[in-house]
C-alpha cells in the first residue's frame, strides 16, 4: 500500500470503530492498516462474513462469490457487478481490480436464495438497476 493510500485509509478510520472481515484473499490480518479483524461479526440482526453460509441465514451480508448479472437491453447483452439479495440476505460484488465475477444464475449464487427468488441490483454509472433473477441471462 502506498503512503498516500495508507494516509487516506487512516483518515477514513479516524473517529470510527473500523472492523475488517477477513476471507480467503487475506487469511492473515494485514499489518499497520488499523482497525480490528473478525471472521464473522454479528451486530443486532445482521451477520457479516466473507463467505455466505450454505444454510438459510436471515440478516447475512457476505461477499466471496462476487456476483455479476447479465441482462439483454436494447438488442445487446450487458454484464455488470451487482448485489444479489432476497431481502433477507445480501451477497456483495467485488470492487477490486483483481477479483472477477460469478453470474447470478450460477448454482453457487442461485442456490443461496432458492428458485431464483432474488433481485440483482446492478451497478450502473449513475444509479443502481434492479432486475429479478429470472430476467438475468445465464453465461
Placement of each model-derived feature along the sequence:
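Core catalytic region of metal-dependent phosphoesterases/phosphodiesterases
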Residues: 1-41
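Short, surface-exposed, charged loop/turn segments at secondary-structure junctions
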Residues: 5, 34-38, 62-66, 75-82
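Active-site neighborhood of phospho(di)ester-bond hydrolases with catalytic His/Asp-centered motifs
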Residues: 18-24, 48-49, 60-66, 92-94
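Core dinuclear metal-dependent hydrolase active-site scaffold
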Residues: 39-61
Amino acid at each position: 500500500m502506498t503512503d498516500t493510500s495508507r494516509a487516506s485509509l487512516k483518515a477514513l478510520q479516524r473517529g470510527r470503530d473500523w472492523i475488517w472481515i477477513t476471507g480467503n484473499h487475506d487469511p492473515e490480518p494485514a499489518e499497520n492498516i488499523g482497525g480490528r479483524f473478525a471472521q464473522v461479526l454479528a451486530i443486532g440482526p445482521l451477520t457479516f462474513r466473507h463467505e455466505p453460509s450454505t444454510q438459510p441465514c436471515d440478516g447475512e451480508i457476505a461477499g466471496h462469490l462476487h456476483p455479476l448479472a447479465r441482462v439483454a437491453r436494447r438488442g445487446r447483452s450487458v454484464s455488470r457487478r451487482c448485489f444479489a439479495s432476497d431481502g433477507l440476505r445480501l451477497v456483495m460484488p467485488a470492487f477490486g481490480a483483481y477479483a472477477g465475477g460469478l453470474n447470478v444464475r450460477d448454482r453457487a449464487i442461485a442456490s443461496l436464495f432458492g428458485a431464483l427468488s432474488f433481485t440483482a441490483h446492478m451497478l450502473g454509472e449513475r444509479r443502481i438497476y434492479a432486475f429479478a433473477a429470472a430476467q438475468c441471462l445465464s453465461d
